[in-house]
UniProtKB/Swiss-Prot annotation:
Keywords assigned by UniProt, alphabetized: Disulfide bond, Secreted, Signal, Toxin
Tissue: Expressed by the venom gland.
GO MF terms, alphabetically ordered: toxin activity
Name used for this protein in its record: U-scoloptoxin(12)-Sm1a
Source species: Scolopendra morsitans (Tanzanian blue ringleg centipede)
Length: 88
C-alpha cells in the first residue's frame, strides 16, 4: 500500500514538472511561418514606372494587431517626404 501511495505521489510530481515545462515552451514558442497570412505585397521596384519627382523604394509596414510582423511594401514614393503615391 505504501508503494502505491509513493508511486501516485511520484507520478503527480512528475506530471506537474512536465506541465510547467510545456507552459514555458508555449510561452516562448515562435510561430512557424506567419507570412502566408499576410497580404501579398509588391517586392519589385522599377524607377521607370514611377512618375516624375518620385522614386521607387521599399518601406517597412506598420505593426498592427492584424499584421504583427514587419513586412516590406515596395512602390513609388514622393521624392522628398517618402509618402506613397497611392494609398492601398
Amino acid at each position: 500500500m505504501k508503494c502505491a501511495i509513493v508511486t501516485v505521489i511520484t507520478l503527480f510530481i512528475c506530471s506537474l514538472i512536465y506541465s510547467v515545462e510545456t507552459e514555458e515552451e508555449n510561452h516562448l514558442a515562435i510561430p512557424e511561418d506567419p507570412y502566408p497570412t499576410l497580404p501579398l505585397r509588391n517586392y519589385s521596384c522599377n524607377n521607370m514606372a514611377c512618375p516624375i519627382k518620385h522614386i521607387c523604394g521599399c518601406m517597412p509596414t506598420p505593426i498592427t494587431p492584424e499584421t504583427p510582423f514587419r513586412d516590406l511594401d515596395c512602390g513609388c514614393y514622393h521624392e522628398f517626404d517618402m509618402m506613397p503615391v497611392c494609398a492601398d
